[in-house]
């Protein structure tokens, strides 16, 4: 009967850190799978070696939700050469290929589970991944495979075939039919039956411990059926169905616990752990009551190492999965790729959010039991060589301090770390000679807790080294420690990364000063670790980026490191064109911060290296990098002024076409206190407009005065000609001038006349006119703020441009009047004002805020007429005093009124304010 075939990964063309192809050897709810390197070349390939030569019946692939290969090819081979060379493809026989869905219909929120039926014999299986499907989440053009499952039979099954043939012959003579409905759903008579427990979906959703129990109970059920113990088989069948639900629930709890650990919410993690243990204990108790559980079934499955939930390859900031994804059937039917491959008609997809990263292997539990002999287990239950460890008993432990936990771990509660590989032994040989193989093995362990404990143990060892230790031993220990620290800085687990930073800080600030080691040792520490630290500042995890950048800044300020001037030399190295956005931004941010802290005097930063770096950064493709470069250049200019200009192009119109250089040079102007080009252009434009406006107003006023004088002269000449006519001429035509005007010589016509309101009076001497302007003229008013006499028609313009308090006024865009600036926002917001009309359509009275007909004559009618402005206080005062006037005076006013009005209508009102000197000038004219 076909069953799951174990395999190991022989080689792969590459992988992203933390997503090795060896992850495919593990099937569990929390596996992360394999990912290709970022921006890799295609095709990518993986070679698997099955534990024995077998006939493959079925392949199952669990694709990633957004890192999806467009096509996967399959090759099979009987053997490999002594040394493996990927290019020797002729040893492999091509089976065919399958195409994967681009996942656009689900919005990259589902994982496709592809089942492919094959019939091929061999021991080596090669998978070739072609170009990825493009989507917005796969920003690094990667392909990934979460899991692969191989189902088949051993290739040497001649005896089994003969046995099957004999059984078929006996069945034929006994009249048994292999298609008998009574046998449907059983394992009998089905040599090609594949157990659902061997399906990939089963392992990807079940708690590993419960999955092992289910398989054991399934074996017992088959034995009970063979022995015709049907009641017991029925009980086992029900127990298996119930345990599958239990396993899925425990799997969800494990994921939630992992999420809490990643978020460092240890209270929630502890709560989930206790919840799992309590639920597991209740289930096992029920199984024991029904005599379905014994000591053999209680053996824990082999454990998996814990990795962080948030991976660096995610397209955006990722959050751990709150629960296991659900299977959902997709009704798409795939065509056969080639005759060798036959896909299952309906594929499945695992629903998962693209923002959620793949959840990684679990934290191992303790195991007080002796190790299981792997050779005595059925093949399906044999552990992989790299993970022969056990779960421990689920017990509730009292609170322990960090030191107690570390000691307990090192004491063997979690078992021993896996032995070092040959590659690791060669790589860490010098560290092993100094620190011992046990400590180095923990530092290389796949379980993150061992790696963290190794750093804590190393820190404790360094702190306890006596002062009298020989210098050579101290140096060797230092270099071995730096080797492990450098490796731990690259770790993707946050706690291990932070532990490496603490150890590095202790070495630099305590270990080296304590033992009085030379600066060469400090330089060795910095030079070996700063490159990998800078690399971590480009991590996709924001927390890791900030942690790494802050530590680099802190380390640069250590007095032991500051004098070496090493870190600044790394920060001013030119940015690589293919460097990540986060890395470039972090380097620029570090440079800007350390420049403020260290300056350019004996710090490793010089004007030359900083300016060359900053000018080159102005060409970077990322806006934030260019913006930071501009800030650095401006900060350098504040300190060094003219020296900075040597590294920049000349300040001319061609250079200023580049917006960055324009910003830089305008920033220089502001620093120097000079006006920028924009400000100078605005000032010149405003001055030109103001001069043109004044010129037009002066021309208009002079033209008006000239026209008025011409009209007056014409009237005087007409009156003189009328005076010399015979006295007996008929005067009933009404054209004769008033008697008062006949005796007025032309050169004295403007005497005793107000040129604003047109009133004439014998009292209008120079002093009398001043008094008239100051108190009585209906066309004038006094400014309440500067006490200057101005025309009412120009009061708004006076308040905005001429008044001593003009800075306190603003213009309302709605009513065009002057309003106090502190009241202007409320004034505009409430919109209570009467909107002004264009100047050509209407005049606007600043006293009553009303619009009226345009023109100069309309001002007189509005301000002096009885139906005009109601807010002209001078007119109101005159009207109140009118009843008290004597009849003689009233007739005098009435007689002079029409003449004054007629004469005044000929003279336009000048713009601008009126002073005593100006009034005298008008009176003399």
Curated annotation (Swiss-Prot):
HEAT repeats lie at residues 529-567, 604-640. Residues 915-925 have a biased composition (Polar residues). InterPro entries: ARM-like, ARM-type_fold, CEP104-like, CEP104_N, CEP104_Znf, Galactose-bd-like_sf, TOG. Keywords: Cell projection, Ciliopathy, Coiled coil, Cytoplasm, Cytoskeleton, Disease variant, Intellectual disability, Joubert syndrome, Repeat. Residues 209-289, 677-725 form a coiled coil. Required for ciliogenesis and for structural integrity at the ciliary tip. This is Centrosomal protein of 104 kDa.
